[in-house]
Amino acid sequence: MTEPEKLKHLLKHWIEHNDAHVKTYDEWASKAGAFGNKELSGILKEIAEESRKLKGLFEKAIEAV
Protein backbone atom coordinates (compact mmCIF):
# COMPACT_ATOMS: atom_id res chain seq x y z
CA MET A 1 0.00 0.00 0.00
CA THR A 2 1.37 3.40 -0.95
CA GLU A 3 1.61 6.29 1.51
CA PRO A 4 -1.30 8.16 -0.16
CA GLU A 5 -3.43 4.98 0.03
CA LYS A 6 -2.58 4.61 3.72
CA LEU A 7 -3.49 8.22 4.35
CA LYS A 8 -6.80 7.87 2.54
CA HIS A 9 -7.57 4.79 4.63
CA LEU A 10 -6.66 6.66 7.83
CA LEU A 11 -8.81 9.63 6.89
CA LYS A 12 -11.82 7.36 6.35
CA HIS A 13 -11.15 5.75 9.73
CA TRP A 14 -10.89 9.16 11.38
CA ILE A 15 -14.27 10.13 9.90
CA GLU A 16 -15.87 7.04 11.44
CA HIS A 17 -14.16 7.74 14.75
CA ASN A 18 -15.27 11.37 14.68
CA ASP A 19 -18.86 10.34 13.87
CA ALA A 20 -18.86 8.04 16.90
CA HIS A 21 -17.70 10.91 19.10
CA VAL A 22 -20.41 13.21 17.72
CA LYS A 23 -23.03 10.64 18.67
CA THR A 24 -21.62 10.42 22.19
CA TYR A 25 -21.50 14.21 22.58
CA ASP A 26 -25.15 14.45 21.50
CA GLU A 27 -26.18 11.72 23.94
CA TRP A 28 -24.43 13.42 26.84
CA ALA A 29 -25.84 16.80 25.88
CA SER A 30 -29.31 15.29 26.21
CA LYS A 31 -28.42 13.68 29.54
CA ALA A 32 -26.97 16.93 30.88
CA GLY A 33 -30.16 18.72 29.87
CA ALA A 34 -32.26 16.03 31.55
CA PHE A 35 -30.42 16.41 34.86
CA GLY A 36 -30.85 20.15 34.66
CA ASN A 37 -27.46 21.42 33.53
CA LYS A 38 -28.48 23.55 30.55
CA GLU A 39 -25.10 25.24 30.33
CA LEU A 40 -23.25 21.94 30.00
CA SER A 41 -25.85 20.66 27.56
CA GLY A 42 -25.29 23.70 25.36
CA ILE A 43 -21.53 23.33 25.46
CA LEU A 44 -21.72 19.65 24.51
CA LYS A 45 -24.09 20.50 21.64
CA GLU A 46 -21.57 23.09 20.44
CA ILE A 47 -18.77 20.52 20.63
CA ALA A 48 -20.90 18.10 18.60
CA GLU A 49 -21.58 20.75 15.96
CA GLU A 50 -17.93 21.70 15.65
CA SER A 51 -17.06 18.02 15.30
CA ARG A 52 -19.63 17.67 12.51
CA LYS A 53 -17.78 20.46 10.68
CA LEU A 54 -14.57 18.43 10.96
CA LYS A 55 -16.17 15.70 8.85
CA GLY A 56 -16.26 18.12 5.93
CA LEU A 57 -12.58 18.86 6.35
CA PHE A 58 -11.75 15.15 6.48
CA GLU A 59 -13.73 14.68 3.24
CA LYS A 60 -11.83 17.54 1.60
CA ALA A 61 -8.57 15.92 2.72
CA ILE A 62 -9.62 12.63 1.10
CA GLU A 63 -10.33 14.44 -2.15
CA ALA A 64 -6.91 16.12 -1.96
CA VAL A 65 -5.00 12.85 -1.55
Q: Residue spans of the language-model regions?
A:
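N-terminal acidic leader/helix
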Residues: M1-D26
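Alpha-helical scaffold segments that form or flank carboxylate-/histidine-based iron centers
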Residues: L7-W14, L40-E50
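Helix-loop segments that flank and shape redox-cofactor active sites
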Residues: M1-E3, Y25-L40
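Short hydrophobic/aromatic patches at helix-to-coil boundaries
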Residues: A61-V65
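Alpha-helical transition-metal enzyme core signature, strongest for iron centers
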Residues: N18-V22, L44-F58
